[in-house]
UniProtKB/Swiss-Prot annotation:
Zn(2+) binds at residues 143, 146, 175, 178. SUPFAM superfamilies: Glucocorticoid receptor-like (DNA-binding domain), P-loop containing nucleoside triphosphate hydrolases. Its EC number is 2.7.1.21. This is Thymidine kinase.
Length: 186
């Protein structure tokens, strides 16, 4: 059917938008599932709960945490709508093949993830999905310094570690000007 991408910096509402879209389909009695990478510590798998950075929770009957997608493709046959949160953590080839295969088999895939790391380098998982996607939504946050629209994520410290799970203690959204002026925070 189709692939939709929701992307942007941290705190731009990607998970909130994913939850909103999935909730709309659930209200229409569509069979939905949400997938999150097993590295994501905002999820409460035992309670089937997905949590955004604001603490908003959605309880979902069908919630799966995994780090590999393609070898589990058969378990998604029963779903019409498949949401994938924190897509930047998944292997880019695995994610691309998974999404393309399911979309070609009549599933709607909604993928949410960061547009880039704190060095403004794009995540391969997003880049590889762009050519095979029907819809791309780029969200913005609010700059922590000047309160203008923010399109980048800046890391406060530990800048030698590219993938590090953290919240506002470690990452902040910033605009281009404030990124360039303040990206020396240690």
């Amino acid at each position: 059917m189709s692939i939709e991408i929701i992307t942007g910096p941290m705190y731009s509402g990607k998970t909130t938008e994913l939850i909103r879209r999935i909730t709309r389909y659930k209200l229409c009695k569509k069979n939905c599932v949400i997938i999150s990478h097993s590295i994501d510590n905002r999820c409460e798998e035992d309670d089937n709960i997905l949590i955004n950075h604001d603490g908003f929770k959605i309880s979902h009957d069908d919630f799966i945490k995994t780090n590999i997608l393609i070898n589990k493709i058969k378990i998604f046959d029963k779903y019409e709508i498949i949401g994938i949160d924190e897509c930047q953590f998944f292997d880019s080839n695995d994610l691309m093949i998974f999404c393309d295969t399911l979309a070609n088999n009549g599933k709607k895939i909604i993928v949410a993830g960061l547009n880039s790391d704190f060095n403004k380098n794009p995540f391969k998982s997003i880049i590889k999905l762009i050519p095979i996607s029907e819809k791309i939504t780029k969200l913005q946050s609010i700059c922590n310094f000047c309160y203008n629209d923010a399109t980048f994520t800046m890391k406060k410290f530990n800048k030698d570690i590219i993938i590090e799970i953290g919240g506002s203690d470690l990452y902040i959204p910033v605009c281009r000007i404030c990124y360039n002026e303040n990206n020396t925070i240690n």
